[in-house]
Amino acid sequence: MTITVGDAVSETELENKSQNVVLSPKASASSDISTDVDKDTSSSWDDKSLLPTGEYIVDRNKPQTYLNSDDIEKVTESDIFPQKRLFSFLHSKKIPEVPQTDDERKIYPLFHTNIISNMFFWWVLPILRVGYKRTIQPNDLFKMDPRMSIETLYDDFEKNMIYYFEKTRKKYRKRHPEATEEEVMENAKLPKHTVLRALLFTFKKQYFMSIVFAILANCTSGFNPMITKRLIEFVEEKAIFHSMHVNKGIGYAIGACLMMFVNGLTFNHFFHTSQLTGVQAKSILTKAAMKKMFNASNYARHCFPNGKVTSFVTTDLARIEFALSFQPFLAGFPAILAICIVLLIVNLGPIALVGIGIFFGGFFISLFAFKLILGFRIAANIFTDARVTMMREVLNNIKMIKYYTWEDAYEKNIQDIRTKEISKVRKMQLSRNFLIAMAMSLPSIASLVTFLAMYKVNKGGRQPGNIFASLSLFQVLSLQMFFLPIAIGTGIDMIIGLGRLQSLLEAPEDDPNQMIEMKPSPGFDPKLALKMTHCSFEWEDYELNDAIEEAKGEAKDEGKKNKKKRKDTWGKPSASTNKAKRLDNMLKDRDGPEDLEKTSFRGFKDLNFDIKKGEFIMITGPIGTGKSSLLNAMAGSMRKTDGKVEVNGDLLMCGYPWIQNASVRDNIIFGSPFNKEKYDEVVRVCSLKADLDILPAGDMTEIGERGITLSGGQKARINLARSVYKKKDIYLFDDVLSAVDSRVGKHIMDECLTGMLANKTRILATHQLSLIERASRVIVLGTDGQVDIGTVDELKARNQTLINLLQFSSQNSEKEDEEQEAVVAGELGQLKYESEVKELTELKKKATEMSQTANSGKIVADGHTSSKEERAVNSISLKIYREYIKAAVGKWGFIALPLYAILVVGTTFCSLFSSVWLSYWTENKFKNRPPSFYMGLYSFFVFAAFIFMNGQFTILCAMGIMASKWLNLRAVKRILHTPMSYIDTTPLGRILNRFTKDTDSLDNELTESLRLMTSQFANIVGVCVMCIVYLPWFAIAIPFLLVIFVLIADHYQSSGREIKRLEAVQRSFVYNNLNEVLGGMDTIKAYRSQERFLAKSDFLINKMNEAGYLVVVLQRWVGIFLDMVAIAFALIITLLCVTRAFPISAASVGVLLTYVLQLPGLLNTILRAMTQTENDMNSAERLVTYATELPLEASYRKPEMTPPESWPSMGEIIFENVDFAYRPGLPIVLKNLNLNIKSGEKIGICGRTGAGKSTIMSALYRLNELTAGKILIDNVDISQLGLFDLRRKLAIIPQDPVLFRGTIRKNLDPFNERTDDELWDALVRGGAIAKDDLPEVKLQKPDENGTHGKMHKFHLDQAVEEEGSNFSLGERQLLALTRALVRQSKILILDEATSSVDYETDGKIQTRIVEEFGDCTILCIAHRLKTIVNYDRILVLEKGEVAEFDTPWTLFSQEDSIFRSMCSRSGIVENDFENRS
């Protein structure tokens, strides 16, 4: 947390700044207090650029101000392919050039073109021409208009949300005049649907125009049947009076076509404005979610873990975008309904009310169905969130899952969640499909009932004009009823999604007042940097807060019920009352005495100390005593319950290393201006020069997501360099030395902490007590919650905790080492500094030579690690459709597909022929048949169409759900078994996108698109066949109209498809950035870089919207031009009818016109469905790729090569001529490695950074396969075994222990293979629980509300937060040791496993390892050499080769050995060796 507390910022200014808050009652603490001249300036802009015209957006949108060159390249470049299209011969062969700069690009023309061009969207033609010749590039698109940029849109939305917040608070103050401001902020909750109202106000003009267009489109479609009636009556009269002039009929024909044209124009503009609103709303809410997470409190982040936020942005916002495009239809629905009712009554008389009654009956049935759909959607969302959260956790920790062979366990967990999710989705889809089938069949059923009633009332009154005009009106209502369920269904999704998002936006935030209160008081001693006076701090009790919120909810619900049932419950305690009593007891217990050693660390009480400017303070203590918490308390990140903290100067906390997916340089300067001299000095003092030299592109090498190309020590030093590069007054360092070896640690201490930062106030939490003498004073934290501060000598005299810790440290050796260095320095005389630099340079050169192969093996030659986002080009391959169909039908394909085709044909035939049969009935075609014959068959065709339609939708739904389920699960299975090299080089956001947005598309959108496409295609074919049957000459026009249709569709798809894919790629960048920001939230807030990352997000969202806006416009362009084709089609038909070119009856004309005048809608619908299907098939394509084509590791199980259960019984490991590379084609990392490790031997592995230490572990676990040679364990070649059989026999304690959200029990034994007694025993043996305390711990139970606050920290049922955030790093390492004990393996690998624990705990762990794994083979990679000096043998690696391999004493005895030199630098002397033989 970075804060600045000084006189330069007045309290008034701070309060004014805190007003600039979005979507929350509270301000962001981390960005309010600042006077630092070296602040993050990469997203800054001058006040003079804040013009009301929006021109400042252009300046803010310059990528070079806050994006590195790699970021710009990623979002502005993609591969170029020439297009080969059907009509390429009509265009010139010249390939258009790609604009290279923004100046060469045209601004989005929507507000900069004439009315005619806007009316027909002609301004999009340049993009279509380019897209027809080659693949569209990001720079081909129109650049963002400031009025449509996310910055402008979000500013408007923010103002509306603040207005609603203030309005809500004002109401609360009026109801509770005694309430304090803090109570108002906490309790004034927004009304439901506030976010929706804010969005509607943001887009009020735009959305109002959409509603106007929707009403106009509905009105024109409602009046068109009246022209149809006139046309039929004209044909009827013309058949009787042959001499009638045809001009009147031609006028009717042209009038009908003009009405169709107006309808198509308004319909397309309605969709354009509403879809545009959907795209913009999604962008706004994406930014709102990210900005909220920057301000969210710890409890809010507990309630909304990263996986849940990701689910909001990827899934819910996509549904909201889709829903907003249909909602204006609801506003236009009453108008068309009124028009149709009036015209039906005019045509048919009061009898029309019968059919209208059927419509209203169906509407009320649909309300019940909507309630069911709502319930299924809410239930499905719960499982979707759980699945996405688990997938995110799995992907973040996939290496750990591979180490522990937990792939099957997590695959099963995900499969179980997915099965439950699919169950709800299936029920929702079936309910929705029944509703759609009913809505589409309702007009036919209503017309059937109406005509039957009309016949009974008036047996002879069947005029063709009235009948078919009414049928057209019913068909218009059919179209409306088709869209109504979609509008309401998507509206339900939108309301649910916005409700979930509103709960996030209302979540509690960091208290900004805590930062303001840290300003020094008047009279503050200027010599002090920090002072604490009677301060108490505590971490939030998440479980208690959850219980309180639950009780509030129950009380609120019960209060509503009691209003209705007050008499029945009078005098009886309610459930909420009991809950409140239990909560009171919890709060009392919580404040009672407790043994901090046995429970979770909660906080500090009554802290009193001060720190002077320039002091170097060390904080130490046993693990779990709150060292990191004390730093957070100083930084203002921990909740203060009492006292006063005063900070005088800029303060920066350097916490757990977070590495951004960017170059090394960008990670170090982190948004500050680049100063080469300062940068080089920072790199030197942080001991990074040698590491940068070995990287292919030096400090411009892309590190890769999650720092995949770096060791733990390198990540720690880059994290340190980032903080040092910032110019601050007070530095808080959280164990920055734990991940580096003693030599590097000493260099950092000398050159950085006590060198470059010598004049700064430095506070270091550490276990490295060998350097404690360098501290001005030391703060020792005790297991009883006490804090003791003093000089080292003072504390040695009185503090038993420090005395115990020092007994395990190498302090005395360090003194000897310093004495030796003093002698050397004296001999060197005047060469002091120059000689040290030269020596360091030589050491770094050696390190460069030794580690070049190792590290370069992880990086491709140009310095990039992340693979480029895959973007398909041209049409979807048939293979994808084949794989999708295979997943959909399984073994029933020979039945399901033919049956579906039969049902589609049957539905179309019955639907169309019911109208034909109505014409037969109207003209009494079969003279000798009774009316019951016509009525019976008409009824049959109507109800058969309904039954066939239901069957068709049900089968398609079943197939779509099955395909989505199995493709997702197969992709999950494959990603769990893909090599680490793929995971390391693929951004997490991209992978997660496959299991969020792509999966959601298959669950909810693809089936709908396929249904639309198949049904509308069948309808169009049916209408064309009908026209040819009645008007044979029309067959001549069909090829010409087909060519025009294909011409338009081909031009559209050439660009529309590519721009949609481009939008998907740009969307992935937005999601990648969001995931990265969520993962590095603490670091970003500490460096006050929120604005920079929000600016980067704005840039990426704008790039996404440049494509997204065009996707919308292209759909409308093609819609209008297809309308023209359909109008030409209709004009030919109507002219053939009115001119009597063929002798057809008026009733037959009525049938033709009823369907021909629907053609514009049918053509638009099918093209939209085809396009949407192809877009959704892109999601299927990506999932199919993951499900079938991801690279796989070697066989997970080999039944024919399963070793005996007792293998390995000895633990002997032999490396024979082993060569190892991280990926095929990359340099060899381990070279010709030959080792023979005997059964039960304890091998210590050491070497400089990049020497290949951790690579041995990768080779043993076969994370990648050997390039040459073999590894034998108990004479079994491990390459012949299945990975499951190999890895489950190995145990590892990694450097970065991982905990999964859940309980300790699930983290130790996710398969439930062990008994509780075995797990308790492992916790005791691992040192997590004292043996004497075990009986008491076993008896502990959660309290009445299910909270675990009073239980032992390592109780099996103790809750584990996401990424184990409620456990310290040392505690997580104890649990990693316990995991290894649970596995009961014969071979144990320690990868710098005790780097983050104090020396006492380190000693205890080493002792337990010796005791518990005494008969096991141990390979220990360590930078604390003292932990391995008494191992059986030491392996020293250099350049991936064996440099030395012998007993520790033998190597130490050799004056020129590498091991001897390393021991000397670590202060290890002869007395440290127990075995000197």
Curated annotation (Swiss-Prot):
Catalytic activity line of the entry: a 1,2-diacyl-sn-glycero-3-phosphoethanolamine(in) + ATP + H2O = a 1,2-diacyl-sn-glycero-3-phosphoethanolamine(out) + ADP + phosphate + H(+); Cd(2+)(in) + ATP + H2O = Cd(2+)(out) + ADP + phosphate + H(+); an S-substituted glutathione(in) + ATP + H2O = an S-substituted glutathione(out) + ADP + phosphate + H(+)
Record: residues binding ATP 1: G621, P622, I623, G624, T625, G626, K627, S628
Domain of life: Eukaryota
Glycosylation sites recorded in the entry for this protein: N661, N759, N799
EC number(s) reported in the record: 7.2.2.2, 7.6.2.3
Binding site for ATP 2: G1247, R1248, T1249, G1250, A1251, G1252, K1253, S1254
BP GO annotations: transmembrane transport; xenobiotic transport
Transmembrane parts of this sequence: 207-227, 250-270, 329-349, 358-370, 434-454, 479-499, 616-636, 893-913, 941-961, 1028-1048, 1118-1138, 1142-1162
Residue numbers covered by motif Diacidic ER export motif DxE: 71-73
Signal peptide: none
Record-listed Phosphoserine modification sites: S10, S24
Residues covered by region (Disordered): 1-48, 552-595
Ranges where the ABC transmembrane type-1 domain occurs: 207-493, 897-1175
Stretches with biased composition (Basic and acidic residues): 36-48, 581-595
Effect of D71A: Causes the protein to be retained in the endoplasmic reticulum (ER) and degraded via ER-associated degradation
GO molecular function: ABC-type cadmium transporter activity; ABC-type glutathione S-conjugate transporter activity; ABC-type xenobiotic transporter activity; ATP binding; ATP hydrolysis activity
Family indicated by similarity: Belongs to the ABC transporter superfamily. ABCC family. Conjugate transporter (TC 3.A.1.208) subfamily.
Name the record gives this protein: Oligomycin resistance ATP-dependent permease YOR1
Protein's organism: Saccharomyces cerevisiae (strain ATCC 204508 / S288c) (Baker's yeast)
